[in-house]
C-alpha cells in the first residue's frame, strides 16, 4: 500500500534516508467504564467511527491512513472481577504515513530566468518532522501563565491534540465524555475507584 501511494503521487520519499521511519501510530483510548455504562460493543463501535474522523483531521487526510482497527478482545480484569461480569476495554489503533507539505523550487540552472526560485511543484513528503501546534497555558481566569522570564508557558502539543479530540467528540454529540486530567499519568481505572464513579464519568486519552 505504501508503494502504491508513492506510485499514485499521494506521497513522496524524495530525499528520505534509507533508515527513515515511514509510519506512525495513534491510539484512541477511553476507559472501560464509559463504554460499559453505555451498553458495550455497539456504542464503542459508533464512538470510534466518529473518533476515526478526528484522526483523519489530525493526519491531514484519509489518503494517508493505512489502517484503523478497533480492538475489542481485551478484558479489563479488575472491573470484571468487581462487577462479576466481563467488561471489555475498547480502543482504536490508527496507523498512518506522516507527511509534511514541501515546495520544490526551480533551481538557478533553469533556462527560464523568470522561473528561477519560484515553485516548481508541491509534494507531500514522508517526514516525522511535523510539529503539532503548542498553545499558551492559561489559568482559571483565562489569563496566560508566565515563566519567571516573562515568557508564556506552552502546553505540550499532545495535550492540545487531546483537547481537539475531546472537542470533536463533544461536537459530534458525545456530550457526556469528559476530558482526562491534563498532565495526569493515570491510564487505567482500578476496581475500587470504578465503583465510586458516576455513570457518566470517563477519562479520555489520545
Give the ranges of each region predicted by the language model.
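N-terminal, leucine/charged-rich tether regions that mediate assembly and partner docking
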Residues: 1-144, 151, 156-158, 162, ...
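Intrinsically disordered, low-complexity sequence elements enriched in Ser/Thr/Gly/Pro
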Residues: 126, 177-180
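Secondary-structure junction/capping motif
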Residues: 127, 186-190, 202
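N-terminal membrane insertion elements
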Residues: 173-175
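Conserved small/polar residues in nucleotide/adenosyl-binding loops
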Residues: 195-202
